[in-house]
Amino acid sequence: MKIQEFNVGPRFIFGEDAISELSNLSIKKAYIVCDPYMAKSGMVHHVLDHLDQGTVETKIFSGVVPNPTVESISKSISEIRAFKPDTIIALGGGSALDSSKAIILTYTSLEKVSKPTLIAIPTTSGSGSEITSFAVISDLLTEEKYALVDDSLVPDIAILDTVFTMTVPPAVTADSGMDVLTHCLEAYVADGASDFSDACAEKAIVLAWENLPLAYKDGNNKVAREKMHNASSLAGISFNNAGLGICHSLSHAIGAFFHSPHGRINTVLLPYVIAFNSSLSHPTVTPTGSRYAKVASMLQFDFQNEKEGVEKLISGIKQLSAQFGIKGTLDDLGIDKSDFIKHIPEMAERALADACTPANPRKVTKSDLESIYYSLARSI
């Protein structure tokens, strides 16, 4: 048996009005990173209201963009170097959290200073970035996505408060929620999976499966929102330790070229990846297929054998995503079929080199990845 480690990550503060705990933290200079909506909508004031304006100096950077870029990150660097914060507060979805991580890594490298305290306040339930040592940054010039992986990127404190998720639109709720499920299912079968990561993934799968439809139908359902927030962090703990797989690798490459929502891309790819990892076209499934069948059993699907269990899980995922208007085709991603096919060889090359690929349970070739892309292109 190989030697493994398991890291839980940040200090978690969660529950109703968890944001109020900000006032009890030792903060002198806070650099708040968010997108323009968080600033214009007043959502950022939920943070400012709990920072003692008499003793805490604050500065807001609201230049976060979806799928953060090298260019957007660079806009903050001169500002943060002059401000010299002792705390960085990341307020937003995965893009804000990933931006904050890239900012903090760049800032500490340039200034040769100790890392400021990083406080993550997620406003969507999906990326799990509030727990992980990962960040994904795009380069618009090269049309590539880069995965940053460093233990210093794990936030010091994560504040989970549903007040920030109540106004998230249904489509974003669905996309980010399906990203949670993708994280769970990839971590559950990843090479680095363990009893510890499995426990987090299993709980998160059940929470997301039960509560995502409820949060989608009624954004004011506080219980469903809270459970999805918890599921997202549990999934993050799981994949931060176990790893991910080719669903994310394939997704990163598509996102780099076509800029579709990350969670939506994962949603349409996931059934194909499960089938591939299980060798579903063969008479019997792989050991990985047995793991997927265990998930199907957890979700109370009826089946006679493991192959049927995998098929039921795939069918269940398609039915779940259909509730959110996601049919599982390129149309869901707003991508032209001929344009997609033209980019398949290069996307497969990038996916093969992606940081998520090594943890996939079934080892892949470029041809394997191209085959999955072509299967998606043929879907109607």
What do these predicted ranges mean?
Residues M1-T87, L330-D331:
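ATP/NTP phosphate-donor binding region
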Residues E16, L22, K40-M43, V70-I73, ...:
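Short glycine/serine/threonine-rich phosphate/pyrophosphate-binding segments
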Residues I80-T123:
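A short, small-residue-rich loop immediately preceding and capping a beta-strand
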Residues T108-D195, T286-K294:
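A glycine/threonine-rich phosphate-anchoring loop and its flanking beta-alpha core
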Residues A174-L234, S238:
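C-terminal and late-domain segments of enzyme folds
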Residues F257-S260, R264-D339:
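Gly/Pro-rich interdomain helix-loop hinge
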Residues D339-I380:
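Short, amphipathic C-terminal "tail helix"
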